[in-house]
C-alpha cells in the first residue's frame, strides 16, 4: 500500500515539473520574439542585437557597415556611392567596388563613374586619358578619336622590281585603298592608303625584244645626256696617204706622182 502511494506521488510531481517547464519555455520564447520585434528597424525582417539587421524586406538592400570589429546590417532603398547592387532571390545586397577612386560601379571590377577630377576609361579611373584616347567635350569619359572611313583594300598587285616583271627573284608587291571620309576633311589623320610587302617569284628571263628596246633606249639616253661629246669629235681628215705617195712641195702645183725605184740603163 505504501509502495503504491509512493508511485502515485512520483508521477504527480513529474507531471507538475513538465508542465511548469513548458510554461517557462513558452514565456521565454514569447519574450525573445517581442524583444526582437522591438529592436529591428523599419524594413528589417530579421535582426540581432549584436549584428543589427540580418534580412531586409524584398525591395530593400542590406549594407554591412563595419563597427569596430563587428559588421552591422542596415537596410537601404539603394546602395550608396562606391557600392553596386547585387540582386538575388534570397536577399539584395550592396557590395563595395574594388576599383580605386571609383564612385559608382556596375560590378566589383567595372567602374561607371569616377571621383571628381578623374577620367573614366574602359571601367577604370585615370588622372588623364591614356594615350590614343581623348576626353569627351562635356564628360570625364575617355573615348577613341573620330575614325576615318576607308575603302576596302585592293588585291595585291604583281610582284615587281624597279617596275620590271622579269629578270629577278625577289621583289615587292603593293595594294592600295582610298579615304572615303575624313573628320574635318583632314586626310593626314587617317591611316595609310598604301601597303607594300616583299615577294619571291621564280626567276624568268626577260624577252629578247625587251632587252633590245632597253639597249636602244639606253644609247639614246646617253646621246641626249652628253651631246657635247659627239660634237667634240673632229671628222677624220683625208691626210692618210697611200704608201709611196709623195706630198707636193710648198709653192708647187699639180698632181702627185709616184716615186718608184730608178733602174740603171
Swiss-Prot record:
GO terms for biological process: male meiotic nuclear division; positive regulation of canonical Wnt signaling pathway; positive regulation of non-canonical Wnt signaling pathway; positive regulation of Wnt signaling pathway; regulation of gene expression; regulation of male germ cell proliferation; Wnt signaling pathway. CDD domains: FU. FU repeats lie at residues 34-85, 91-135. One of its GO terms (cellular component) is nucleus. Residues 147-207 form the TSP type-1 domain. The FU repeats are required for activation and stabilization of beta-catenin. Activator of the canonical Wnt signaling pathway by acting as a ligand for LGR4-6 receptors. Upon binding to LGR4-6 (LGR4, LGR5 or LGR6), LGR4-6 associate with phosphorylated LRP6 and frizzled receptors that are activated by extracellular Wnt receptors, triggering the canonical Wnt signaling pathway to increase expression of target genes. Also regulates the canonical Wnt/beta-catenin-dependent pathway and non-canonical Wnt signaling by acting as an inhibitor of ZNRF3, an important regulator of the Wnt signaling pathway. Acts as a ligand for frizzled FZD8 and LRP6. This is R-spondin-1. The lineage of its organism: Eukaryota, Metazoa, Chordata, Craniata, Vertebrata.
Amino acid at each position: 500500500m505504501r509502495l503504491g502511494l509512493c508511485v502515485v506521488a512520483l508521477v504527480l510531481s513529474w507531471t507538475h515539473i513538465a508542465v511548469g517547464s513548458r510554461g517557462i519555455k513558452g514565456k521565454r520564447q514569447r519574450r525573445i520574439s517581442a524583444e526582437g520585434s522591438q529592436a529591428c528597424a523599419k524594413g528589417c525582417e530579421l535582426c540581432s542585437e549584436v549584428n543589427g539587421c540580418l534580412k531586409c524586406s524584398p525591395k530593400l538592400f542590406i549594407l554591412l557597415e563595419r563597427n569596430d570589429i563587428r559588421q552591422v546590417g542596415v537596410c537601404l532603398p539603394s546602395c550608396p556611392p562606391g557600392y553596386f547592387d547585387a540582386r538575388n532571390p534570397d536577399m539584395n545586397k550592396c557590395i563595395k567596388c574594388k576599383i580605386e577612386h571609383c564612385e559608382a560601379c556596375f560590378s566589383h571590377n567595372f567602374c561607371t563613374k569616377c571621383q571628381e577630377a578623374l577620367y573614366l576609361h574602359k571601367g577604370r579611373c585615370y588622372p588623364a586619358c591614356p594615350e590614343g584616347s581623348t576626353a569627351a567635350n562635356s564628360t570625364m569619359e575617355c573615348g577613341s578619336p573620330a575614325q576615318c572611313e576607308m575603302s576596302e583594300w585592293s588585291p595585291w598587285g604583281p610582284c615587281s622590281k624597279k617596275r620590271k616583271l622579269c629578270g629577278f627573284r625577289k621583289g615587292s608587291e603593293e595594294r592600295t585603298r582610298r579615304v572615303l571620309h575624313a573628320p574635318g576633311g583632314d586626310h593626314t589623320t587617317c591611316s595609310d592608303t598604301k601597303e607594300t610587302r616583299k615577294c619571291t617569284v621564280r626567276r624568268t628571263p626577260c624577252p629578247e625584244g625587251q632587252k633590245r628596246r632597253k639597249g636602244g633606249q639606253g644609247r639614246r639616253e646617253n646621246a641626249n645626256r652628253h651631246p657635247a661629246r659627239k660634237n667634240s669629235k673632229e671628222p677624220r681628215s683625208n691626210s692618210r696617204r697611200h704608201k709611196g705617195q709623195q706630198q707636193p712641195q710648198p709653192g708647187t702645183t699639180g698632181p702627185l706622182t709616184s716615186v718608184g725605184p730608178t733602174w740603171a740603163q
